[in-house]
């Protein structure tokens, strides 16, 4: 009975006999059904890429963004329920703002990730609330700390990464990320690879239309989190499409 959650999935404050919290697992399932987001840390910064599915032709281009500015030096990429993610982005902004007001300098990313993770975890403890149905990545760059990348999931656990993927195609994306020599690459190199990975893992059968969102923070941007300029994004998309075409042609030749 406990393996299917009967009776034990009505509250986030209830454990099943085998030690599972089903409400948190359901929140993670919401993330797994979402479009893919990836973050890669390199020697001079962090690059985010998001596969933003276009569910209607009537949507205005650029709406419902999944990349957020948390602070001048911190960016955020999300997968899962967008409304939940926006709420957590506001919490992260408030934490960053309060830290600067109190101490007079930018909040360290590890501290910010821990603070927001504690907030997310608090929503897994009480029957009166539900867990957040989103996972998100935080990335920053500073001269002292270098590039940093953290991921926080609906259970409230925070992990540090060199490369991370969340969303429906996370396994395929992680496989592609593992092939990269991230520690030797720059943001300029990584942004092309991020675009390529998003195009590789995109499911054209189920999800035909999507927009590629790219942002970065690093030495190139003087430590500020910014959307990747249009010309560089288009160049990265061109590289991704050409790489896919070459791979398809090589597969045909092998057959």
Curated annotation (Swiss-Prot):
Residues recorded as bearing N6-acetyllysine in the entry: 57, 206, 230
Against SUPFAM superfamilies, the record matches this protein to: N-terminal nucleophile aminohydrolases (Ntn hydrolases)
A biological process (GO) of this protein is:
proteasome-mediated ubiquitin-dependent protein catabolic process
Record keywords, A-Z: Acetylation, Cytoplasm, Host-virus interaction, Nucleus, Phosphoprotein, Proteasome
Q: Which InterPro entries match?
A: Ntn_hydrolases_N (IPR029055), Proteasome_alpha (IPR050115), Proteasome_alpha-type (IPR023332), Proteasome_asu_N (IPR000426), Proteasome_sua/b (IPR001353)
Induction comment from the UniProt entry of this chain: Down-regulated by antioxidants BO-653 and probucol. Up-regulated by bacterial lipopolysaccharides (LPS) and TNF.
Which residues are modified to Phosphoserine?
Answer: 243, 250
Pfam family, any one: Proteasome_A_N
> How is the subunit organization of this protein annotated in UniProt?
The 26S proteasome consists of a 20S proteasome core and two 19S regulatory subunits. The 20S proteasome core is a barrel-shaped complex made of 28 subunits that are arranged in four stacked rings. The two outer rings are each formed by seven alpha subunits, and the two inner rings are formed by seven beta subunits. The proteolytic activity is exerted by three beta-subunits PSMB5, PSMB6 and PSMB7. Interacts with AURKB. Interacts with CDKN1A. Interacts with MDM2 and RB1. Interacts with the C-terminus of TBXA2R isoform 2. Interacts with DNAJB2. (Microbial infection) Interacts with HIV-1 Tat protein.
* Family statement: Belongs to the peptidase T1A family.
Q: What protein does this entry describe?
A: Proteasome subunit alpha type-3
Q: What is the native source organism of this protein?
A: Homo sapiens (Human)
Q: What is the lineage of its organism?
A: Eukaryota, Metazoa, Chordata, Craniata, Vertebrata
